[in-house]
């Protein structure tokens, strides 16, 4: 509708975010922060991890990064299609590939609507991670680009990041592997977020975390991690201590390195 398009064009708030999703042998792990900003004087909290599903049949999770109005429009269109029973929708299609394709087409359509309504040179793009499982198929994880195309996670590359990814990438590259147990993978992902939070003010608590077990076909409740969360605070402290201790235990550089 017209008022929604006008709001979409005027909204300049961006999800300066970090989202991480893992597709492993035993299941899927999703973590997103919640910070958005339209400048240093306007910082807000918005959920960026969205779930859909039918217990016993399908579980779908979407994570968003980019222009807030664009991402909310995409989620809104997908939800409206379910309410109005429009075809295709997230509950009527049969494979996760089709889910990623539907999300990509919806995103592309939203961006085309924006470009037809404004000549302003502003980035309204966003990226979306799509993961889940539909009965009869395997778990899948996709990275959907603003152009509507997408790529799939593999056993060799079992994770995707969107947003402010560089600070949290090293621990994933060094420690994560496809057969890693889900609890270890969750811990690895939380350390990735702790590293990002320490180095980038545009990413902030609270975090939303969710773990899906393969072939369970349930919609997990998930966990909101706040500043006073005891476990997250504990692993943050222990990770810092482990790095300092590991540095001290490394062999000292030989004279030809620095003398």
What are these language model-derived features?
Residues 1-15:
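Short, Lys/Arg-enriched N-terminal segments with co-localized hydrophobic residues
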Residues 12-15, 19-116, 162-180, 234-259:
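Conserved short S/T/G-enriched processing/targeting/catalytic segments and their helical context
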Residues 18-20, 48-52, 114-120, 129-131, ...:
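A generic local secondary-structure boundary/capping motif
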Residues 24, 67, 131-137:
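Short, flexible beta-strand-to-coil junctions
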Residues 29, 61-63, 127-129, 141-143:
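Ordered hydrophobic segments in well-structured contexts
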Residues 57, 123-125:
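Short connector loops at helix/strand junctions that flank enzyme active sites
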Residues 99, 106, 110, 125, ...:
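A two-mode feature
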């Amino acid at each position: 509708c017209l008022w929604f398009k006008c709001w979409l064009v005027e909204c300049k708030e961006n999800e300066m975010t970090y989202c991480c999703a893992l597709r492993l042998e035993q299941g899927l792990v999703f973590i997103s922060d919640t910070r958005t900003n339209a400048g240093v004087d306007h910082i807000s909290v918005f959920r960026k991890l969205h779930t859909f599903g039918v217990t016993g049949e399908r579980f779908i999770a979407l994570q968003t990064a980019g222009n807030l109005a664009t991402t909310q429009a995409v989620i809104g269109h997908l939800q409206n299609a379910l309410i109005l029973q429009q075809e295709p929708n997230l509950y009527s299609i049969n494979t996760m590939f089709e889910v990623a394709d539907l999300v990509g087409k919806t995103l592309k359509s939203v961006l085309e609507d924006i470009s037809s309504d404004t000549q302003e040179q502003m980035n309204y793009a966003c990226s979306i991670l799509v993961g889940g499982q539909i009965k009869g198929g395997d778990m899948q994880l996709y990275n959907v680009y603003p152009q509507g195309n997408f790529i799939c996670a593999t056993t060799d590359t079992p994770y995707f990041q969107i947003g402010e990814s560089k600070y949290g990438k090293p621990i994933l590259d060094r420690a994560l592997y496809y057969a890693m147990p889900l609890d270890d993978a969750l811990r690895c992902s939380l350390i990735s977020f702790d590293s990002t939070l320490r180095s980038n003010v545009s990413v902030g608590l609270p975090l939303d975390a969710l773990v899906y077990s393969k072939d369970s076909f349930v919609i997990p409740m998930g966990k909101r991690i706040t500043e006073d969360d005891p476990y997250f605070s504990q692993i943050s402290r222990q990770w810092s201590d482990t790095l300092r201790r590991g540095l001290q235990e490394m062999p000292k550089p030989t004279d030809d390195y620095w003398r």
